[in-house]
């Protein structure tokens, strides 16, 4: 019985996915994912990226955000990306495959960043969801806490942080912490984000270091 439910749910999700206008648009424009349009909408509102910037992309695969960022920052810019999943190469993107929660992977990522601070840290990380919010939300919050820890280590003064967060237990405290570290903080729900999803994007600008 449970198997049939999962199958029906999966079929419904796939049907919605392929009918999604942003999925169709991404496919037509040969983009890595619909997430490209989420970041584009944020950029139109908040102007995070400029030519020559250095950007860290956490949870990068399949590469929609890295693809967008490198187009914004140009040949003189640099994207350092990390994901537990494989990602096809993108010109200008330095990709590290590994689990960001692993200390060795984190150290390898920090080595790639180097001593110079970065301009933007962005995270589209999400756990594998079980369908049980009591399990999924803490897992998701753990990942966004790690992303914020990364900011504290590598983000330059006045730098920006963009992070996908799932609303639920811990969200308000997390938002409060970000507001204590950045001059300007917005909570965005891009049009390309599915309406019934708990996800929102915290856009934080003016890191106080």
UniProtKB/Swiss-Prot annotation:
State one molecular function term (GO).
Answer: rRNA (uridine-2'-O-)-methyltransferase activity
EC id: 2.1.1.166
Which NCBIfam families does the entry mention? Answer: PRK11188.1, rrmJ
Q: Catalytic residues?
A: 164
Q: Which reaction does it catalyse?
A: uridine(2552) in 23S rRNA + S-adenosyl-L-methionine = 2'-O-methyluridine(2552) in 23S rRNA + S-adenosyl-L-homocysteine + H(+)
- According to its UniProt entry, what is the function of this protein? Specifically methylates the uridine in position 2552 of 23S rRNA at the 2'-O position of the ribose in the fully assembled 50S ribosomal subunit.
The organism's superkingdom is given as Bacteria
UniProt xrefs under Gene3D superfamilies: Vaccinia Virus protein VP39 (3.40.50.150)
Q: Which classification does the entry list for the species?
A: Bacteria, Pseudomonadati, Pseudomonadota, Gammaproteobacteria, Pasteurellales
Designated name of the protein: Ribosomal RNA large subunit methyltransferase E
Q: Which UniProt keywords apply?
A: Cytoplasm, Methyltransferase, rRNA processing, S-adenosyl-L-methionine, Transferase
Q: Which organism is it from?
A: Histophilus somni (strain 129Pt)
The protein's gene is named rlmE
List, alphabetically, the GO terms of the cellular component aspect. cytoplasm
What does the sequence similarity comment in the record state about its family?
Belongs to the class I-like SAM-binding methyltransferase superfamily. RNA methyltransferase RlmE family.
Q: Does the keyword Cytoplasm apply?
A: yes
Keyword S-adenosyl-L-methionine found: yes
